[in-house]
Amino acid sequence: MNATTPAHRPQLHIDTRGQGPDLVMLHGWGVNSAVFTPLHEQLSEYRVHYVDLPGFGLSQPIAGDLSTWVDALIHALPANAIWAGWSLGGLVATQAAIRYPSHIQGLITIASSPCFMAREEEAWPGIPPQVLSMFGEQLGQNLPKTIERFLAIQAMGSETAKDDIKQLRDLVLARPLPDAAALTQGLDMLNQIDLRPQLSAIQQPWLRIWGRLDGLVPKRVQPQMPTANHITDVMLAKASHAPFVSHMEEFLQAITPWLAQFKD
């Protein structure tokens, strides 16, 4: 479906498939919801809403910050859904769970961090500032090449990196390239957003999936995250930043039993 909203709220492209509890899937920076195509059949027991984030894929850009994006998504998606976000999408889903707890029944973050930027003064592991700066500078020069480089970094470390990059690229390029302003918005979010002080507000069941070989969200993030009875961590030993591509079977083994709690 395409979520049509009042004229002042731009259109979001949402591809809804399957039957069952509502599950929202949010992609990462530089790509679109087509990256989740391999999961369509595997998640058919859920009513899955594959969302193109604002300015990505077939969605129109939405000016503003992370909160603006979250507000637009909340208005376009069913209440009482499970929200799953990969990378930047995980940041969006986390903010949504914090701001709209009654709308979100459960949270899944995949290779995602509440604070993507490395903070040396706090010994917080993350992306070195110069890496995000480099991508920001390259955006104005060669958009397709910049996205391809980013895809390569996401697969780095995986034993099947070459195949992973090709699969990601083929899926992503089936839709229009992202809007340049949306890419800058996304980089700013990765650069500036720090949700760590607000994580205690998340009381919904929360599944966090990590890749031990992830070059963007280092494995050292996980031990520094809050723990509680409603939180489950799964570290995939041989996965990098795109575990649902490189290790789909292990990824599904992590999410399938966890999702089952919402079927009753």
UniProtKB/Swiss-Prot annotation:
Metabolic or biological pathway, per its Swiss-Prot or TrEMBL entry? Cofactor biosynthesis; biotin biosynthesis
| Active site annotation, chain numbering | S87 (nucleophile), D214, H241
**Name of a matching Pfam family:** Abhydrolase_1
Q: Which gene underlies this protein?
A: bioH
Q: What is its EC number?
A: 3.1.1.85
Similarity annotation: Belongs to the AB hydrolase superfamily. Carboxylesterase BioH family.
GO terms in the biological process aspect are: biotin biosynthetic process
Summarize the subunit comment. Answer: Monomer.
Query: What InterPro entries does the database record attribute to this sequence?
Result: AB_hydrolase_1 (IPR000073), AB_hydrolase_fold (IPR029058), AB_hydrolase_sf (IPR050266), BioH (IPR010076)
Localisation: Cytoplasm
Q: What does this protein do?
A: The physiological role of BioH is to remove the methyl group introduced by BioC when the pimeloyl moiety is complete. It allows to synthesize pimeloyl-ACP via the fatty acid synthetic pathway through the hydrolysis of the ester bonds of pimeloyl-ACP esters.
Protein name per its UniProtKB record? Pimeloyl-[acyl-carrier protein] methyl ester esterase
Q: Which transformation does this protein catalyse, written as a reaction?
A: 6-carboxyhexanoyl-[ACP] methyl ester + H2O = 6-carboxyhexanoyl-[ACP] + methanol + H(+)
Q: Which cellular component terms (GO) are annotated to the entry?
A: cytoplasm; membrane
Main localisation, per the record?
cytoplasm
Query: What keywords were assigned to this record?
Result: Biotin biosynthesis, Cytoplasm, Hydrolase, Serine esterase
Record HAMAP family: Carboxylester
Positions with a binding annotation for substrate: W29, S87, L88, F150, L151, A152, I153, Q154, H241
Q: Please name the GO terms that the record assigns under molecular function.
A: pimelyl-[acyl-carrier protein] methyl ester esterase activity
Give the AB hydrolase-1 domain ranges. Answer: 23-244
